[in-house]
Amino acid sequence: MAAMRRLAYLFPAFPVLHQTFTLFEVVGLKRRGYEICLFSLRSGGGGPQQNEAEPLVAETEYCPSLLSRAMLGRFFHAVRQRPGDVTRLFAAVISAWRERHPGASDHSEAPAATTLSFGERVLAVYHHNAWVYLAKSLVLVPYAIWLGDRLRDRGIQHLHAHWATYPVTTAYLVKKWAGIPYSFTAHAYDIYMIDRMLPAKVREAAFVVTCAR
């Protein structure tokens, strides 16, 4: 990353107390002279945090909620100005979702529900069902448009996302919308919980880092 002195980081939530690795990765890069712009799909939920997180929270730009005026206004402006490109973003999600890694085990269905309570069954479907995953991924199109425009306005040269699920789906779509290259760090559950879309996201990335096999 020697040539990337100005880059953005995207998190699903930031800061999160037990995810110290993301916090200290950003701190380490800043100490080495990188200009890091922080973005998060949602807030970290408050509560106690490491001392190093406090100044970074003030720097973090949180994506507006889906139904906010800022998000919907940006999305419908994009629909008016670039309708074909917006349509291609939705098509890219569906195409990537259909692609599976050869020989991958099927984690697209919820776990056996015989020992689960009703609430646990609902959560299992929400987190594991492939069709739910597709729906939640399609919802990221407006986020990618908003984020892509923000990154381009700020002159960001590269986007790095943590977790191979929704943050990387957003980065994948940002590249298609704004032409900004991305990389990502995958961890564990995000690789194995649902393997949909992963081949496309890996193929499009500048590089991938993972701590799991």
List each model region and its residues.
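N-terminal subdomain of nucleotide-sugar transferases
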Residues: 1-70, 152-154, 180, 207-211
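A short acidic, amphipathic alpha-helical/loop segment
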Residues: 25, 170-174, 196-201
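A conserved catalytic-core segment of Leloir-type glycosyltransferases
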Residues: 43-135
